[in-house]
Amino acid sequence: FAVAAPMGEDSGWNDCRSDASDNPSGDDVAFIGAMIDEIAASYGIDASRVFATGLSNGGHMSIRLAEEAPDLIAGFAAVAAADSAASECTSSQASVPALFMNGSGDGLMPCDGGAMANGAMVFSSEETVARWVERNGAVAEPTVETVEDVDPDDGSTVMISRYAAGPGGAPVV
């Protein structure tokens, strides 16, 4: 497999959050689409098997790709990111396999929703997952797994909720 790690304008991405004080103005969806085309042409990758992922602003950009250009990606993983409560994206409503990884102790991306450090408002992690479960036509009841706590002294635990793809839909984790 191949990994491409692009950097957005001014080290950030124009990621749909219209109320974020630090959002650049570039057309990052077009930039990433052109990057995928160039890499596919130059290195022979299968453009139908491209996945997007990112942390924080990069996670929000992955969400934007899924919303506005689902034909560019086969799925996405958003880390420390949630749906914008003040989105300027135009959503296609297409089903896109989704993975969200958020932590309840994150001081920048509030797991319970609300204002981020840059002033942008986001839905809670739970609301974001529910929105994608509905959008993707996933099964409403998840399979829940609690990961073994290998270090009980670190104060953290991991829970995985898997929403299977419904007929014609896509899964959400």
Where do the model's predicted regions map?
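Serine-hydrolase catalytic machinery in alpha/beta-hydrolase-like enzymes
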Residues: F1-F51, H60-E68
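Primarily recognizes the serine-hydrolase "nucleophile elbow" in alpha/beta-hydrolase
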Residues: A40-S42, A47-V96, G107
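The feature captures the conserved acid-bearing segment of alpha/beta-hydrolase catalytic domains
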Residues: A74-S156, S161-G168
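Active-site-adjacent mobile loop/cap segments within catalytic or ligand-binding domains
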Residues: V173
